[in-house]
Amino acid sequence: MSQNEQQYLDLAQKILDEGSHKGDRTGTGTRSLFGTQMRFNLAEGFPLLTTKKVFFGLIKSELLWFLRGDNNIRFLLEHNNHIWDEWAFKKWIESDKYTGPDMTNFGLRSQTDENFAKIYKEQKDIFVNNILNDDEFKEEFGYIGNVYGKLWRSWETNSLTAGDETVDQVARLIDQIKETPNSRRLILTAWNAETTPQAPLPSCHVLSQFYVADGKLSLQMYQRSGDFFLGVPFNIASYSLLLHMVAAQTGYEVGEFIHTIGDTHIYNNHVDQITEQLSRPMHKLPKLWLNPEVKSLFDYTMDDIKILDYDSEPAIKAPVAV
């Protein structure tokens, strides 16, 4: 039995049993706990959940997108990754350039109105096609604001900061781990108090701290808000992957990924799905392969990252709260 996965299942059950009933921005409602933590020993295996299928291709393409410093969804769509579609789509339908059917509250309406769901899909397909094939449209509606990749790779400085106009936090982090591994300042942040609150979806995983001890590199990530059924399994795998990649490029073995979450919630319309997941058996965790020929964190491609021996229960679909 995997303690890595069991702690996720145990926490899911605790949220169901003890979580406070809260309203939320999306109008969906949640069961919520505040201040939770899971610790994943990466020597046990790669923590990609097995009680439901988690699509690793989406995780690695999103992380590569972050590491590119990108905040336009075209790269994701080119890799058939639609994780961020809804937030860019919302920007389009709320603009004066949109002339199609009324898309108000499209997230909730598409779940309860079969006819509207078809209309929504038609408009979404138009949007995706335009992002992929129309450069002007991509420039106007493909950006999702000052989030992750943009903040990681090109944090904008102010007039009081000497030197470059932007800070590449990731490049600096790699240098710091190599040169001052005992530093307590091995930090990567994605929360800018000035610009982040105005983003379509303000950063959820906001702070990461790396830690070197006994020849191993560990990582703790603080997440202000965790959608426990849909989002958190991706976050666990994504930051475990990031830890593996940074360790490979700095000469360390991997240690622990420590996941600390503020508002840890299960949406009311995910309760049936996570209850189904809790009834399923676990399988042995898979292994991660990284191409050892890659010499820079920024040179990895989709083909350089693979998951091996992944055996899981089937996927469980659930609506995204937007």
Swiss-Prot record:
Positions with a binding annotation for (6R)-5,10-methylene-5,6,7,8-tetrahydrofolate: 227, 321
Binding locations of dUMP: 25, 184-185, 224-227, 235, 265-267
Any GO BP: methylation
Subunit structure: Homodimer.
NCBIfam families for this protein: PRK01827.1-2, thym_sym
PANTHER family on file: THYMIDYLATE SYNTHASE, THYMIDYLATE SYNTHASE 1
Descriptive protein name: Thymidylate synthase
Species the sequence originates in: Leuconostoc mesenteroides subsp. mesenteroides (strain ATCC 8293 / DSM 20343 / BCRC 11652 / CCM 1803 / JCM 6124 / NCDO 523 / NBRC 100496 / NCIMB 8023 / NCTC 12954 / NRRL B-1118 / 37Y)
Native organism taxonomy: Bacteria, Bacillati, Bacillota, Bacilli, Lactobacillales
